[in-house]
Amino acid sequence: YIDADMYFYSSPEFVFEEIKGKKCSASIIEHRFPNNITRSTNLRLHGKYCVEFNTFFNTEESRKILTWWKKKCFESCSMKLNEESFGDQKYLDEWEKRFGNIHEVENAGAGVAPWNLSDYRLEGKESNGIYLTYKGKQRVKLVFYHFQNLRFLDENTVNIGVYNEIGRKDRALINELY
């Protein structure tokens, strides 16, 4: 599953290699909410995991996960804030407990988004991609960026949504992404 508001800055091949190496039924990506005043509220209302780049293998266990998820989404896929569901994504928080054999993608270059942008700094652009520093210490290659909350206000104006989130942002990184 790939969310429609994402852009790939480099091939996800090494993310697939990570997933294949884990022999899992499915993979999910953490929101990676920054450790700030809004973290616990974001986790409670939006869930630990983001529906953006979910991988499923053609196995019986994977089909069980997909069938259960589909059923839950038919029951409620509301974006109204509550503690039970949020669209199609809060259900992902139950996958590890319910099904096991779920891999949480470790590569921090996958899943960069407005809500976690304050934890990233632009390190540089090289011939093979854009490199970031995650949480001040980990060098990662940008795989994809999730353009959530992008709004066209009129023909010439776009609200990019990154300043709606708490935390200091790297302007050079924002300029590179947008």
Name the predicted role of every residue range.
Residues 1-178:
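Glycosyltransferase catalytic domains, chiefly GT-A lineage
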